[in-house]
Design a protein with these regions (language model features):
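Motif-centric detector for short Cys/His coordination patterns
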Residues: 1-119
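Active-site environment of non-heme Fe oxygenases that use a 2-His-1-carboxylate facial triad
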Residues: 93-136, 141-142, 146-317
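Active-site pocket scaffolds in enzymes
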Residues: 323
Length: 323
């Protein structure tokens, strides 16, 4: 890949194609002291104030450093490498950690122990890598006093306050505004599907667990989605294309969002799942399409609730699950 100059034009040649770089693209990257703040790299001018009929009048190539002269009287120097790096960055997929599928046989997952100096340690790096691989990690020994979980959460990213506050105590209360405040057993689901955006990382922190039972159950939405895609492609297609309404209402707030049960990214790769049968409302569609949708929703519900995909264990005081 290289930069080529032909007459008063700049081209990028990637080996297969040779494309002219728009002169305005080059003009708005002017880096003179009166045009660009050297500290924060923010422009000191509005590029929309530049005449769009911009052209290059002269180009001098000084051993990989282009000295550009434009028809509006400005000129500056830019390295060929800067142009090449911008081109490469816009055509590369971001570095990702490969997802690992798991089911009920996944019972030897590593547990990480919280230490007071964990925040900038290799252990934290390993914890985050494991999180991205499997979608969850188990962390032990997290302090249970003074809402320490908030401090821990802020070490990963900014805590997002919701209508429930910075944190949510799962307990039974009278006149609850959410089923998590009741003793009702909850089947596998994703939390807060009615938010936009939905939670990125949630932290479940066990303060005490002295009851019989009280197990935590996890299901991998990625594994289930991929299985649906493999065995029932027509179900996968409709679950990833039909948006349903998720809704939460109490005395002070109404929260709604529309989303697919299997959400894909712009390249049609798996991004996330939303699943909360007590909160979702299908749209009005043709009967045949809804027939297929309801069959697909039942099938994915069967999978989420199947023992085949569940990992179940009991959290002890101080244990936490980022998920």
């Amino acid at each position: 890949m290289k930069i080529e100059i032909d007459s008063k034009k700049v081209f990028i040649n990637n080996g297969n194609n040779k494309e002219e770089i728009h002169p305005f693209w080059l003009r708005e990257r002017i880096n003179n002291e009166d045009a660009l703040d050297k500290g924060n790299q923010q422009r000191l001018f509005d590029p929309n104030s530049i005449n769009t009929n911009i052209d290059i009048e002269k180009i001098e190539n000084e051993d990989g450093l282009l000295n550009l002269f434009f028809n509006d009287g400005t000129n500056y120097k830019i390295k060929e490498d800067q142009i090449l790096n911008e081109y490469k960055s816009q055509n590369l997929d971001p570095i990702t950690i490969e997802k690992v599928k798991w089911d009920s046989n996944f019972n030897d997952f590593k547990k990480f122990k919280f230490e007071k100096d964990i925040f900038e340690s290799k252990a934290m790096h390993d914890l985050l890598v494991s999180f991205y691989k499997y979608g969850f990690v188990v962390l032990t020994n997290i302090p249970t006093k003074d809402n320490f979980i908030i401090k821990f959460a802020n070490s990963i990213g900014s805590v997002r306050r919701t209508n429930f506050g910075e944190f949510f105590n799962v307990r039974s209360v009278p006149n609850p505004n959410d089923l998590a405040y009741t003793s009702l057993a909850l089947s596998p689901h994703t939390d807060n599907p009615y938010r936009k955006p939905v939670p990125c990382v949630q932290l479940l922190h066990c303060i005490t667990n002295n009851v019989s039972g009280g197990n935590s159950t996890l299901v991998d939405g990625y594994t289930v989605s991929e299985k649906i895609k493999e065995d029932y492609p027509e179900y996968y297609e409709i679950l990833s294309s039909v948006k349903v309404k998720f809704k939460f209402i109490d005395k002070t707030v109404v929260l709604e969002d529309m989303s697919e049960l299997i959400k894909l990214d712009e390249k049609n790769n798996f991004k996330q799942v939303r699943f909360s049968p007590r909160l979702d409302y299908a749209p009005i569609l043709e009967k045949s399409k809804l027939d297929l949708f309801y069959k697909a929703r039942n099938k994915i519900s069967e999978a989420y609730n199947s023992d085949k995909y569940k990992v179940e264990f009991k959290l002890e005081s101080g244990d936490g699950i980022p998920n």
